[in-house]
């Protein structure tokens, strides 16, 4: 397998990260490194799909799968960076770099090496000479769909939860977050495993390179999760502590004690937020504090004095008197002259 495409991707990622380092010197946001990392993954997948020496089918799948996965992550991180302030990890990086400019440069360059290592499984999968859709190909596509949809779904659920002001200081227990405290890490691991399945058929020495991305994902998750949970305990206290006691840390699973435990049962179901139309109706129906409610003219009653009943029309029931026939008369009733 020719290593030249990997070297080209490394050079491209390094150039992108150097430009990003220059931009963040003015923007003062270290989250730009993660944004550019996702862009490098997407660009690397498209490049490998063009230049790899494998069959057409695996090259197309790598370009589509890797390109879409990187683009989704790029858009998610871009939206979060524009709307939300930098998280605690990036703030710590920025504070450390204020006294050491070269340290932030080294951080951005390390992200270029990280993106290149994560792209190696894409290149290996694109080098597969198998030109037919096998059972491994179908399994790889299925695992990829599960991983990517799980990543996207968990990110969307968490973003919607954070958008509601009433959820400040609370822990998201909605959707996938009911079953795992870190579903985004779990489904990212599943996503990267799909390229190992797509590369089945290559020699073991080459195929083993596809395990780089899942292994790195697991290492990153194990390193970041303790810091993330320590920050959550500091900001959310007992709410997050009870969440830890009932919810799996990584692999999605039923809350512990459900359905016998009341806390686990409450974590199992969280009412969905009201729709925008329902919220607008509730806002119009709920009076503001101190507002005076004026009844409509049709329902207005006199304030002083007794309530005078309104006259009512009484409809008399028409009673028909039956005709009394004389036994000896043959003249119809109504024609008798008086």
What are these regions (language model features)?
Residues 4-17, 40-73, 103, 115-157, ...:
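Hydrophobic transmembrane alpha-helices
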Residues 27-42, 85-106, 170-177:
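Juxtamembrane helix-capping/reentrant segments at transmembrane boundaries
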Residues 328-336:
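Short, intrinsically disordered C-terminal tails of secreted or membrane-associated proteins
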């Amino acid at each position: 397998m020719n290593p030249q495409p990997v070297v080209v991707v490394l050079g491209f990622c390094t150039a992108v990260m150097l430009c990003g380092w220059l931009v963040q010197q003015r923007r003062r946001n270290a989250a730009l490194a993660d944004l550019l990392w996702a862009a490098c993954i997407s660009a690397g997948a498209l490049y490998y799909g063009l230049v790899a020496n494998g069959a057409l089918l695996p090259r197309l799948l790598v370009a589509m799968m890797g390109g879409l996965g990187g683009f989704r992550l790029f858009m998610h991180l871009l939206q979060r960076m524009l709307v939300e302030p930098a998280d605690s990890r990036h703030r710590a990086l920025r504070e450390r770099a204020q006294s050491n400019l070269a340290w932030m440069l080294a951080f951005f360059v390390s992200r270029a090496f990280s993106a290149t290592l994560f792209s190696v499984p894409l290149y290996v999968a694109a080098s597969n000479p198998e030109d037919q859709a096998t059972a491994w190909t179908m399994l790889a596509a299925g695992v990829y769909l599960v991983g990517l949809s799980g990543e996207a779904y968990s990110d969307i659920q968490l973003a919607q939860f954070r958008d509601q002001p009433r959820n400040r200081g609370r822990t998201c227990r909605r959707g996938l977050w009911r079953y795992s405290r870190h579903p985004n890490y779990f489904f990212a691991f599943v996503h990267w495993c799909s390229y190992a399945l797509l590369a089945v058929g290559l020699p073991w020495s080459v195929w083993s390179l596809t395990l780089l991305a899942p292994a790195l994902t697991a290492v990153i998750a194990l390193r970041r999760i303790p810091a993330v949970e320590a920050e959550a305990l500091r900001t959310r206290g007992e709410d997050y502590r009870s969440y830890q006691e009932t919810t799996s840390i990584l692999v999605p699973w039923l809350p512990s004690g459900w359905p016998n435990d009341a806390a686990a049962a409450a974590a199992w179901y969280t009412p969905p937020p009201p729709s925008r139309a329902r919220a607008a109706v509730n806002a119009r129906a709920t009076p503001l504090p101190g507002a005076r409610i004026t009844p409509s003219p049709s329902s207005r009653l006199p304030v002083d004095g007794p309530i005078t009943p309104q006259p009512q029309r009484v409809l008399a029931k028409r009673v028909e008197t039956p005709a009394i026939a004389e036994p000896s008369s043959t003249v119809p009733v109504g024609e008798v002259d008086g």
